């Protein structure tokens, strides 16, 4: 599929998880469109280090950037020399993440290609609430009664948390090409600590800008663990928020609409809320989706995400004030 000379330039073959990404053709078409557009933007700017600033997937003998061996799907990506990733989430790297993901969205704001949803309804809050309500109606594991408090709290916030979908239907909020898996380790850095490019593009698809903003903060600004049993550990770290937001707005405010900017605090709350809904639905269903390490694991996760949500809500006025100072 890939000749010997090419293989010497490449990392090892990578299998595509087609259990999650069932439409591999769409998945790779999205990635090809995005990397081609970014490459064109970099060329127009006169970038001299393009091969380290955007991913490149090598074509198979079919001409496509993936192939099927009869059982699995594979692809090969060109090696990026002298590049590394970091797991650290601190204000410095959170700022870099904000710059990188904001710049990623900015470069793709005028992409002419129409991308598909590689995971349909991935960040659709109305869809996630329907899943929860269906789980409650079925009560397959007989657990609804014990989680009534969380169900009531979720429903109390449901109208507010679904406003992105409503605003989109009203024509006020656009969908844009987003990364949809914004973690600090999804960025490549050079030997001097400068950001090279955003990686792991499997989830690139149309979404609201809230996806990339809120998803990073859900994990990066959580002072505790996603499944922390001690809720005293779980709070929203405003230093991480400020660093990420500063970087994000520096690179993204040129294309963002006022309605997108003013709803960034909503985005910070949306993702712990959404994950709370998903963990709770799985607990009610009898733990059929997420891997668990003990019987109450999904309930513990639910409680931790709800505590994070409450902390985000408490910091909303401070977030609004900081965002205003960045514009």
Label every model-predicted segment.
Residues 1-7, 11:
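Single conserved hydrophobic/aromatic residue that forms the stacking wall/gate
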Residues 5, 16-130, 209, 225-229, ...:
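Conserved ATP-binding subdomain of kinase catalytic cores across diverse folds
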Residues 15, 22-25, 80-95, 110-179, ...:
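ATP-dependent phospho-/nucleotidyl transfer catalytic cores
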Residues 74, 175-177, 196, 208:
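Hydrophobic "anchor" residues on beta-strands that sit immediately upstream
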Residues 185-225:
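Catalytic activation segment of kinase domains across protein kinase-like and atypical kinase folds
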Residues 210-254, 270-289:
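Active-site activation/catalytic loop segments of kinase-like enzymes and analogous catalytic loops
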Residues 256-268:
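All-alpha amphipathic helical-bundle segments outside canonical DNA-binding/catalytic cores
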Residues 312-316:
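Long, compositionally biased intrinsically disordered regions
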């Amino acid at each position: 599929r890939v000749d010997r000379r090419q293989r010497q330039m490449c990392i090892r073959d990578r299998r595509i998880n087609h259990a999650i990404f069932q439409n591999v053709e769409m998945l790779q078409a999205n990635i090809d469109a995005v990397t081609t557009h970014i490459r064109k933007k970099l060329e127009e700017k006169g970038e001299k280090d393009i091969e380290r600033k955007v991913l490149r997937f090598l074509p198979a003998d079919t001409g496509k950037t993936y192939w099927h061996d009869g059982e699995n799907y594979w692809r090969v990506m060109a090696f990026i020399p002298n590049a590394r990733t970091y797991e650290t989430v601190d204000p410095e790297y959170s700022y870099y993440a904000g710059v990188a993901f904001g710049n990623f969205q900015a470069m793709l704001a005028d992409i002419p290609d129409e991308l598909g949803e590689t995971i349909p309804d991935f960040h659709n809050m109305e869809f996630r609430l329907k899943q929860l309500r269906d789980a409650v109606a079925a009560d397959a594991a007989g657990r609804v009664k014990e989680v009534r408090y969380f169900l009531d709290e979720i429903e109390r916030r449901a109208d507010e948390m679904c406003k992105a979908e409503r605003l989109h239907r009203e024509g006020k909020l656009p969908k844009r090409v987003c990364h949809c898996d914004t973690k600090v380790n999804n960025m490549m850095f050079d030997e001097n600590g400068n950001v090279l490019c955003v990686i792991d593009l499997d989830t690139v698809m149309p979404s609201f800008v809230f996806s990339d903003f809120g998803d990073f903060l859900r994990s990066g600004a959580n002072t505790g663990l996603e499944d922390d049993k001690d809720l005293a550990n779980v709070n929203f770290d405003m230093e991480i928020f400020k660093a990420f937001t500063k970087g994000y707005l520096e690179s993204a405010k040129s294309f963002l609409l006022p309605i997108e900017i003013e709803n960034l605090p909503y985005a910070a709350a949306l993702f712990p809320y959404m994950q709370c809904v998903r963990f709770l639905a799985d607990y009610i269903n009898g733990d059929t989706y997420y891997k668990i390490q003990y019987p109450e694991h999904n309930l513990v996760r639910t409680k931790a995400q709800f505590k994070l949500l409450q902390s985000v809500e408490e910091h909303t006025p401070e977030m609004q004030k900081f965002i205003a100072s960045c514009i």
